């Protein structure tokens, strides 16, 4: 069992609870997100944890995968680029918004679930909301499930990470994986050449 965590404190609680591994959700991740730098988050966790550790957050290229490993993570956890694959069970407009988007098209808000999450601004606007005026109801309990409002947070308002600029078109999953692999190997060779 791997558990998503956004802080060192949550990581410790998860390990105390018996998880087998951790997914460090750092700044830039799609959907529910952390606000800590991946360098700081992985470093803090690696001071005491030597078990399986994935890094998530703004990972969309092979270079990003190499960087995740360089921080001390065992592997990278990638989400948003896979939404824009042919096999993904996402509506065409969601996929198109990712392909056409970049980091500037992402908003971080706790207004929908009480927990900070990254969403595509365009999907917030399509739901009839003003992204600049979103506010969390402090009296409302935190709820990460779909809402009973006129829109469903995860169905109509689309989670997405900041690394989407790397997503240029809708491709089969195998093609995305092959691209990530090629980019990783090229980045690894370049890095090894630099350090001699």
Each predicted region: which residue ranges?
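Conserved active-site-proximal phosphate/metal-binding subdomains
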Residues: 16, 38-54, 60-196
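Conserved short-loop catalytic and cofactor-binding motifs
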Residues: 2, 29-33, 56, 82, ...
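Glycine/Thr-rich beta-alpha phosphate-binding loop at enzyme active sites
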Residues: 4-43, 85, 89-91
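Hydrophobic faces of well-ordered beta-strands that scaffold small-molecule active sites
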Residues: 1-3, 22-24, 53-56, 76-78
């Amino acid at each position: 069992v791997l558990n998503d965590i956004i802080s060192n404190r949550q990581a410790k609680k998860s390990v105390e609870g018996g998880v087998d591994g951790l997914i460090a959700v750092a700044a830039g991740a799609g959907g529910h997100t952390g606000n800590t730098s991946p360098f700081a988050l992985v470093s803090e966790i690696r001071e005491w944890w030597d078990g399986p550790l994935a890094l998530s957050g703004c990972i969309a290229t092979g270079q990003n995968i190499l960087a995740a490993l360089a921080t001390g993570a065992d592997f990278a956890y990638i989400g948003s680029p896979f939404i824009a694959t042919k096999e993904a069970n996402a509506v065409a407009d969601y996929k198109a918004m990712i392909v056409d988007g970049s980091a500037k098209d992402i908003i971080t808000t706790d207004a929908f679930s009480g927990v900070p999450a990254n969403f595509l601004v365009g999907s917030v606007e399509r739901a009839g909301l003003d992204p600049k005026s979103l506010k969390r109801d402090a009296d409302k309990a935190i709820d990460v499930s779909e809402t009973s409002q006129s829109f469903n947070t995860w169905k109509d308002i689309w989670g997405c990470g900041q690394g989407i600029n790397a997503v240029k078109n809708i491709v089969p999953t195998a093609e995305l994986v092959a691209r990530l692999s090629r980019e990783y190997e090229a980045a690894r060779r370049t890095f090894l050449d630099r350090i001699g």
